[in-house]
UniProtKB/Swiss-Prot annotation:
This is Polyprenyl transferase dpmpC. Diterpenoid pyrones display various biological activities and FDDP C shows anti-cancer and anti-HIV activities. FDDP C also shows inhibitory activity of 42-mer-amyloid beta aggregation that is involved in the pathogenesis of Alzheimer's disease. The gene is dpmpC. Gene3D superfamilies: UbiA prenyltransferase (1.20.120.1780). Pathway: Secondary metabolite biosynthesis; terpenoid biosynthesis. It is found in: Membrane.
Length: 345
């Protein structure tokens, strides 16, 4: 009986983190694209500096870190929103809202996921394979660095990458409150930043401390901006599925800004995406990227906006799934670009 209860609890915790759905993968897209393309760029600049295997390893670690941290963020979101979720048809069965998971269990689960993310971030930004194989050895190295006065610099470097998304994840659920609307703050603003920021981490995972933090941010700014507007666009359509319940509960969401002109709002939100994409891709001398990114995204956006129907809120879910496939396609395009760069070495 005890074993059965533990299995049910584990299942509920996984559901609480949305690990039973495809949505956590969205949090990894920017990091994956950035890691792969940074690898392709560095191979082109300094072929002997890294190997494709290293880039793929860093890509895998970036995926795990973003995926797990998304889970931690949803735990915090659901805890803050538990009373609201209990009165919304789509969310009333979530583990915290339904009482299947206690606050203590949820908070412990959230802390464990946050610590796991921090550990993976340390591995990525240090680039040390031994950290994966032997955590005790990693601790010994950290102590040795501190004794020699080199521990704080590395820690500060890693915190620069982790703290922004940590703070944004904390603030996200409060962006849905009516008070936030008075300040013209919508949750999609914060969510866009959360999903876009891993692009900086992914680029740093390839270039490491060979590149200053400010230069990494500058390099990734067009990609971060592109992902930022993309997430606001697709999440506005996705959250519109709950429009009836949200209005009853006075939940703040960006689609309220569109009023009766939601379709035009989505067009306006989608428009900056290809512009930011152009700014990012101009750094790469690759027809393949121009064709697969700009061509693929433009065609997909046109199809999405044609089929979205404000009279059918469920069409927002279809648009969301279409963008998920677009993200998967872009991973493939970036992986091919990495292989193309490796073949020229």
């Amino acid at each position: 009986m005890a074993a059965s209860n533990k299995i049910h609890l584990l299942k509920d915790l996984l559901i609480l983190s949305r690990f039973n759905k495809y949505t956590p993968v969205f949090a990894s897209f920017a990091g994956l694209w950035s890691t792969l393309l940074a690898g392709a760029a560095r191979l082109a600049e300094h072929p002997s500096a890294i190997s494709p295997a290293f880039v793929l390893r860093q890509t895998g670690l970036c995926f795990l870190a973003a995926y797990i941290f998304y889970g931690a963020g949803t735990v915090w979101n659901d805890w803050v929103d538990r009373d609201v979720d209990a009165n919304v048809a789509r969310t009333k069965d979530r583990p915290l809202a339904s009482g299947k998971v206690t606050t203590f269990q949820a908070m412990l689960w959230m802390v464990l996921q946050t610590l796991a993310t921090w550990y993976l971030l340390n591995v990525m930004l240090d680039g040390n394979d031994l950290y994966v194989l032997n955590p005790l050895h990693a601790l010994m190295i950290a102590v040795h660095r501190i004794k020699n006065g080199r521990g704080t610099d590395g820690c500060t470097y890693r915190w620069k990458h982790f703290l922004p998304v940590l703070v944004a994840s904390f603030l996200y659920p409060f962006g849905k409150r009516p008070a936030a609307r008075k300040l013209y703050v919508y949750p999609q603003y914060i969510l866009g930043f959360i999903v876009a920021w891993p692009a900086v981490i992914g680029w740093a995972a390839t270039y490491g401390q060979h590149q200053p933090f400010t230069e990494t941010v500058r390099q990734c700014l067009p990609l971060c901006s592109m992902v930022y507007f993309w997430i606001i666009y697709l999440n506005t359509a996705y959250s519109y599925q709950d429009v009836a319940d949200d209005r009853k509960m006075n939940v703040n969401s960006f689609y309220n800004l569109g009023g009766q002109h939601l379709h035009l709002l989505l067009v306006a939100l989608a428009s900056p995406v290809p512009v930011c994409m152009l700014l990012f891709l101009r750094e790469f001398d690759s027809f393949w990227l121009w064709a697969t990114w700009l061509g693929g995204w433009t065609a997909s956006f046109a199809e999405q906006l044609i089929h979205f129907d404000p009279k059918e809120p469920a069409s927002g879910g279809t648009l969301h799934k279409s963008n998920f496939m677009l993200g998967i396609w872009t991973i493939f395009a970036c992986a091919v670009e990495l292989l193309r760069s490796a073949s020229k070495v």
